[in-house]
């Protein structure tokens, strides 16, 4: 053993660690490595220290401050990353480690970063704006489904549509919903549905899956095809917790394919309830309409009665009777006052001690009586004359007298008497009052 030891090279710990480091750096050099970050720390120096691991192993890593400043994201535990590193050994402790030169997101982390970048770009262009959203048809007669023909999502949609609204026409646009061909096929089917115009609304979606599985619904081409679709589109991708770019661009986002089917279909009982409700509203509207027309007819009849010539004549007759009554009352009052004055004078004469004065006053009284009788006769005669003249004038002005001589009174629809042809237009209704009856006619021509 001592002989063997004399022939072997004996290393110190430092020499061994140095040799191992040189061997690692010389033989492996720079490597590319993917893994999940764990045990991440960042001391005040700014360097990053962490481990990269997979299901079976892990390795210590260091990324110095000047290098990690170039990384476009903040490293965190759980991130999947792709690193370029040098394999080395930390001699003081003999720890095998990687010195990281560059770092990029990998797997879902990279996809999530691309997702956020595209989301910001499309939002800045206004593709998510609410005023671009189209309303879903209130009663869809046909619905198009863009999805995998063999997927469970299609069966869920068809089952709900059949249960809720069997009369709804369904058109299936088969496409891949995962893989390299999915993006182009989805865009093609959206454009085909818009070209055919055989459906009222489109459902675009699939069942649940990983972010990578759902990635075709995060592609920019699919987002722009949804935005430019003239048919309203419901996105129904994955489960309620899955969010895709298609959800933001679509007119309506359904949390699941089943929920999308319920959005485009109306339950039969709901349709019957809606029909009954509208029937009630129609009946109420018709009742209000007829009541309004009846009230209008009653108002027109009342106005016609008020403007009838016989009504006007009755009013004039009442006014004449009132005037005659006032005249007779005035004359009676005048006579009573004169008689009272004469009685007073007679009493004064009877009480006078002077016969001559009595005789003289008697003569005056006789004269006054004669004058009074003469004046009263003139007054009554003049009053009778004036009364006869007024009655004759009133009778001559009576519309019925004019109508009795073969004349007529023509009025417009507002009840105004027509004096010339400029007060009416061709096509309007007019009413003609005769001595007996009214004729309603329509103006066909006018002459000056």
From Swiss-Prot:
Task: Provide the protein's localization.
Answer: Cytoplasm
What does the UniProt keyword field contain? Cytoplasm, Exonuclease, Hydrolase, Nuclease
What is one GO cellular-component annotation here? exodeoxyribonuclease VII complex
Q: Which GO terms describe its biological process?
A: DNA catabolic process
* Swiss-Prot/TrEMBL catalytic activity: Exonucleolytic cleavage in either 5'- to 3'- or 3'- to 5'-direction to yield nucleoside 5'-phosphates
Q: What EC designation does it have?
A: 3.1.11.6
Q: Which InterPro entries match?
A: Exonuc_VII_L, Exonuc_VII_lsu_C, OB-fold_nuc-bd_dom
- Give any GO molecular function from the UniProt entry: nucleic acid binding
Name the principal localization, coarsely classed. Answer: cytoplasm
Family statement drawn from the similarity comment of this UniProt entry: Belongs to the XseA family.
Question: What quaternary structure, including any partners, is listed in this protein's UniProt entry?
Answer: Heterooligomer composed of large and small subunits.
Name the UniProt record assigns to this protein: Exodeoxyribonuclease 7 large subunit
Which species is the source of this protein? Histophilus somni (strain 129Pt) (Haemophilus somnus)
Gene behind this protein:
xseA
């Amino acid at each position: 053993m001592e002989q063997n030891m004399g022939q072997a090279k004996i290393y110190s710990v430092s020499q061994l660690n140095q040799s191992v480091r040189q061997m690692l750096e010389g033989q492996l050099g720079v490597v590319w490595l993917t893994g999940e970050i764990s045990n991440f720390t960042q001391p005040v120096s700014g360097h990053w220290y962490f481990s990269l691991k997979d299901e079976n192993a892990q390795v210590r890593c260091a990324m110095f401050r000047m290098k990690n400043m170039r990384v476009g994201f903040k490293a965190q535990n759980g991130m999947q990353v792709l690193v370029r590193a040098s394999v080395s050994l930390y001699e003081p402790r003999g720890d095998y480690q990687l010195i990281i030169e560059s770092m990029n997101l990998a797997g879902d982390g990279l996809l999530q970063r691309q997702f956020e970048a595209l989301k910001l770009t499309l939002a800045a262009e206004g593709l998510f704006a609410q005023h671009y959203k189209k309303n879903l048809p209130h009663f869809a007669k046909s619905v198009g489904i863009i999805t995998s023909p063999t997927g469970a999502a299609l069966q869920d949609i068809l089952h709900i549509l059949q249960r809720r609204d069997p009369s709804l026409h369904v058109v299936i646009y088969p496409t891949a919903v995962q893989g390299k061909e999915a993006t182009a096929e989805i865009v093609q089917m959206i454009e085909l549905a818009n070209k055919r115009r055989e459906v009222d609304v489109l459902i675009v979606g699939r069942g649940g899956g990983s972010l990578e599985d759902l990635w075709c619904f995060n592609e920019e081409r699919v987002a722009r095809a949804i935005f430019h679709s003239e048919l309203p589109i419901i996105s129904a991708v994955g489960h309620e917790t899955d969010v895709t770019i298609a959800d933001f661009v679509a007119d309506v986002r359904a949390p699941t394919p089943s929920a999308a089917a319920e959005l485009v279909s109306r339950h039969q009982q709901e349709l019957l309830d809606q029909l009954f409700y509208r029937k009630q509203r129609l009946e109420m509207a018709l009742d209000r309409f007829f009541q309004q027309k009846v009230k209008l007819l009653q108002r027109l009849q009342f106005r016609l009665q008020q403007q009838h010539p016989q009504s006007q004549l009755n009013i004039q007759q009442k006014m004449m009777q009132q005037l005659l009554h006032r005249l007779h009352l005035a004359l009676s009052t005048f006579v009573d006052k004169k008689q009272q004055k004469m009685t007073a004078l007679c009493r004064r004469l009877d009480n006078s001690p002077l016969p001559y004065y009595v005789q003289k006053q008697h003569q005056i009284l006789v004269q006054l009586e004669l004058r009074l009788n003469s004046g009263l006769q003139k007054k009554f005669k003049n009053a009778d004359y004036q009364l006869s003249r007024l009655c004759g004038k009133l009778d001559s002005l009576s519309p019925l007298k004019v109508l009795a001589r073969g004349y007529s009174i023509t009025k417009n629809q507002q009840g105004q008497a027509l004096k010339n042809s400029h007060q009416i237009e061709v096509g309007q209704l007019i009413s003609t009052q005769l001595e007996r009856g009214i004729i309603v006619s329509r103006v066909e021509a006018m002459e000056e």
